[in-house]
Amino acid sequence: MLDCYVVKEVSNDKLKWEYEFVIDKKYFLDQLDSKLSEIAKNVKVPGFRVGKASIDLVKKEYLNDVMTDVVRKTIESTSSDFVKSNKFGEIISSNIDIVSYPNYYSDNDSKEENLVYKLSFEVMPEAPLMDIDSIVLNGIEVDIQESDVSEFIENLKKQRPNFIVVNGAEYAVQEGDKVVIDYQNKVKGKILRGGSAKDFALVIGKGVALKEFENQLLGMRVGETKSFPLTFPDDYSVAYLAGKTTDMSVVVKSIYVVKDVQDNESVARSYGFKDVAEMENFVRKQIGQQFDQMVLTIMKKELFDYMDNTYSIDVPECVVKQEITKINKEILDSGEDIQIDVEKEAVRRVKLGMLLIRMSRHNNITIKNEDVLSFIKNNYTDYGVDINNVLKMLQSNKNFANYISGKVLEDKVINYIIKLVKKDRKVMTTKEINLMFENI
């Protein structure tokens, strides 16, 4: 530890500390004079050759700048020396408040004539290591019943409805029907670019076209022609149409209605399966994968509750504040009326994060490139996001990269723990698991 300063503890509040430093005046002035002498050897002062100006002239010109630089370096060296010597651990926030500056021209060695500053900081404590052997979670196994398979197949039918053509001119278009039309869209009698089509098919209510356009088709019959004004919204994706009113003309050429397919054999063939048995095996596998993810989420919640209730940790105030800001943004972005104790949730998240980090360090759990790519695939590209855009974000946005790394490491540690803990085997139906999942 350096002997050029004296330290006094001002406050100590769990993880937050404050100290007052008084720097030895002779030490400081020696540093200042050394720097001024170094400058004097190389500086060019008007009227003098390089290095020939008197030290008094150099002081007059450079004292303030040199003083600022020496103060900065002295604070850095003494505070760093003190923190390292006392092994405070990981400092996550700090602040310097200069109380007084030394008077270069005074011989007074009182405290007020010295460099005095206060250093306040907050440390990240080491969380306790969790005892994995004491953790018991519910090892839920899903019981897939015939009714689950039947319900899944019914949803397959709805996703690929069986349309049959309507014969005759009496039937009027309804919501859910498929219509085949010819249309022309004009402004001042001129057809717009891309504003006409023949044999254009759309299902009413699917949102393929503007709602106002679809509403005009409701009630029309085969062979009927209709003209009407159509106003495009101000934020319409095609810029030259945004906010404009056009003249639309439509002819209904054919109408198709949904006819439920009763036999599963037809459904199986429509999806490319060779028979019903192959389709049902596929369905069981899909249901199993879906509920495996739900069970994993339920087990994570159980694990987090156990960690939160079992371990008491002092959490850093500055990290909690950052988490509060993050949670408030999540609530705002969701657009939902979420009623939670934000500060309590922030403290919980920080505590859980500290416990997981300790576990990762103790067991040398690290993340690899393939872990990151797998996470991106499961959470972004499987939902239509271009993987190249995500990778560019990783390289250009440090906050996003830190977020992804944190989530990947968290998942890896959680999966490591869940794999090792004791489990009480429990067989549950899909309805029971759904209920548990909804109550998380």
Swiss-Prot record:
It comes from the Bacteria. The keyword Phosphoprotein does not apply. PROSITE patterns: FKBP_PPIASE. Residues 176-261 form the PPIase FKBP-type domain. Its EC number is 5.2.1.8. Its main location: cytoplasm. One of its GO terms (biological process) is protein folding. Involved in protein export. Acts as a chaperone by maintaining the newly synthesized protein in an open conformation. Functions as a peptidyl-prolyl cis-trans isomerase. Consists of 3 domains; the N-terminus binds the ribosome, the middle domain has PPIase activity, while the C-terminus has intrinsic chaperone activity on its own. This is Trigger factor. The gene is tig.
